[in-house]
Each structure stands twice: as C-alpha cells, then as structure tokens.
Amino acid sequence: MAWAPVVVWAGLIFALSAQPNLTFMPDAGADFVVRKLGHMAVFGILALLLWRALATTTTWRRPWTWGLMLAILYAATDEWHQAFVETRHPSLLDVGIDAAGALIAVAAVLLIRILRSRRS
C-alpha cells in the first residue's frame, strides 16, 4: 500500500500532461507563474511520496536520494510525453523547474528533521 499514493499521484500528473491547452488564468503572466509554481509543488509532492514508499518498502540507504532522482526522471519522461499531446511541447526548463520543486521539498523535510533532532 505504500506505493498506492505514488501511483495515484503519477497518474494525476500523466492525466494533466495529456490535456491540450491547459490554462488556469486569463492573464498570461499570472498563468505562467501559477503553472510553474504548480510544477514545483506537484513534483515536490511526488518526491516526498517516493521517499516515503522507498523508506517503507526497501532497505536502501538514503531513500530520499532515490525519491528525488526518480521524481526528476519522471519529470523528464513527463515532458517527453507532452511531445505527443496536441498544443503541448516538451521543455527542459520545465524539467529544471520540476527538479527544483522536488529538491526544495526534500531539502525542507531534511532540514526540519535536523532541526528537530537538535532540539531533543
């Protein structure tokens, strides 16, 4: 069951990437910012879900590293998938933004853990 949230979340990403003409706001500038922040949030969550699933189902050292790498790999394949969707196109910039979101999420959780361990 540890992998169910990962599968659901990855499926949601895939479904959204398959939608042509995805816009959220009438203002193009605001829409751009919202979409890029959305990329960061979505892949940050994916990295954390992967971390959790790996930590509970494997004996791998540093599962956060693997979760981060797998989230970035999924970001790259997600952009490749968009090459086959009408009106969408793959973007290395988006892969970088997705990777940044995954990295920020993982780093934030690691920082919180470090700060908590210092208090006790």
Residues covered by each model-derived region:
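Membrane-helix interface segments
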Residues: 1, 59-68, 88-92
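"…centered on the first transmembrane helix and the immediately adjacent amphipathic helix/loop
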Residues: 1-52
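Lipid interaction determinants
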Residues: 3, 33, 63-66, 110
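Lipid-exposed faces of alpha-helical membrane segments in multi-pass integral membrane proteins
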Residues: 4-15, 44, 69-73, 77, ...
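Short helix-capping/hinge motifs at transmembrane helix termini and TM-loop junctions
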Residues: 19-20, 55, 86, 113
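Interfacial helix-loop-helix junctions of multi-pass membrane proteins
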Residues: 25-27, 32, 75-99
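Membrane-interfacial alpha-helical segments at the cytosolic side of multi-pass membrane proteins
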Residues: 42-56, 102-113
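Short, charged juxtamembrane terminal tails flanking transmembrane helices
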Residues: 117-120
